[in-house]
Design a protein with these regions (language model features):
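TPR-adjacent "capping" and linker segments in tetratricopeptide-repeat scaffold/adaptor proteins
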Residues: 4-8, 60-75, 206-209, 213
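Position-specific recognition of the canonical hydrophobic site in helix A of tetratricopeptide repeat
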Residues: 23, 84, 118, 152, ...
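Canonical tetratricopeptide repeat
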Residues: 17, 50, 78, 112, ...
């Protein structure tokens, strides 16, 4: 198979074999050209390390296939690679597992099996498979991030944080590692620590590229949770500068403006743009309905809020919002029913207390009381 075909089909091992052969023949420069042609400016860590060794004039040993058993392992791995997305994941997993059993140091086969196990919900097996990648291997960082993700999916949140903290301590100059560590802290509601870690990752970036929007977006969310709205707004705006039109940013910034009662025309336009990009995302539809609601356009808010409720039927916030909308258009019995439903979905304590007040007093009285409290707090 020509290397171009190998790259197209994801058979990285075929490319690696040709690179090693060229190196053994004293054609290291040709091997570098091959890597650059197939991987451009973004080779994976392993291929980047090989390219660096070639640049230094080092000869790369041929170790893709050393024995007949290695050859069988390559055959099963190649079959697994070709089956990805073409058949059920169990059959692909079977071939990847056979390859890694025949050759336990076949890291690509081990990683493929681990990721398939995670996809199939076999998290304990996935964690064990990721753990087989030895420290020092070019894929080790990727394996630990995968292991932490599987631990997260298995509900082992503390284990995920520990794995990524250890990895970040050893790779303090790796933006991807710091980003993953920040994510694990954020999921544990450790927003202060997550904000600091995201900041470390951002500080390492010499030239921002569009993909960096995610770091600013996530840090913005953490800052907002900490009550630092100016910092959050700045991060959301920076994220939007890097990725104009990204619906998640448009929705988050737009909804935040709506919730704060600020920049409402601009907020509505942002959310409408997000809805146009993701018309079946319940949380974005909810934002649109809430933007109409906060602008007093209660009748306009009914249809999108009902759609959001259909898309997210057990979300306490969406259900609470639906109750508010129904109340404002005179459908008060339906509003009370939705508030009771919202309470059954276990909202946060503060939200639950406010919903109960609406059931006890009605939304009009709750809003009036909140307005008086705000005016009193402002010295009005």
């Amino acid at each position: 198979m020509r290397p171009e075909s190998a790259a197209i089909h994801g058979l990285r091992r075929g490319v690696l074999a040709q690179v090693q052969v060229l190196s053994q023949l004293g054609r290291g420069a040709d091997a570098i050209v091959l890597i650059d042609r197939l991987y451009g400016q973004a080779p994976d860590a392993g291929m980047a390390a090989i390219r660096q060794r070639l640049t230094l004039g080092e000869k790369i040993a041929f170790d893709v296939v050393r024995t007949p058993q290695d050859g069988m392992a390559e055959a099963y791995f190649s079959l697994a690679t070709l089956l990805v997305g073409q058949t059920n994941d169990t059959l692909t997993l079977l071939n990847a597992r056979i390859a890694s059993a025949l050759r336990p140091d076949h890291v690509e086969a081990v990683l493929m099996a681990a990721r398939l196990l995670d996809k199939l919900g076999q998290y304990d097996l996935s964690i064990s498979a990721f753990a087989q990648v030895p420290e020092g291997d070019a894929a080790y960082v990727s394996a630990i991030i995968g292991q932490a993700a599987s631990a997260q999916s298995a509900g082992e949140l503390d284990d995920a944080v520990t794995l990524l903290k250890d990895l970040a301590d050893k790779n303090a100059d790796n933006v991807g590692v710091l980003g993953a560590y920040g994510d694990s802290l954020r999921r544990q509601d450790q927003c202060g620590a997550a904000t600091a870690v995201y900041g470390q990752a951002i500080a390492l970036i010499k030239t921002l590229v569009p993909g960096d929007w995610v770091l600013f977006y996530k840090r913005g969310g953490c800052r907002q949770n900490q009550g630092d709205w100016p910092g959050a707004e700045a991060d959301y705006k920076q994220a939007l500068t890097l990725a104009p039109g990204e619906p998640r940013i448009l929705n988050e910034l737009g909804y935040s403006y709506v919730d704060r009662g600020e920049n409402l025309p601009q907020a509505l336009a942002m959310i409408q743009q997000a809805v146009a990009a993701k018309p079946e995302q319940g949380y974005i539809i909810d934002s649109l309905a809430w933007a109409y609601f906060r602008r007093g356009r209660y009748e306009n808010s009914v249809a999108p809020m009902e759609k959001a409720s259909l898309l997210m039927p057990v979300d306490p916030i969406v259900t609470d919002h639906l109750g508010d909308v129904y109340w404002m258009v005179g459908r008060k019995r339906e509003a009370q029913f939705q508030w009771h439903r919202a309470l059954s979905f276990h909202p946060a304590p503060a939200e639950a207390a406010r919903i109960q007040l609406k059931l006890d007093k009605g939304l009009d009285q709750v809003l009036q009381d909140e307005k008086k409290a705000q005016e009193g707090g402002n010295g009005g």
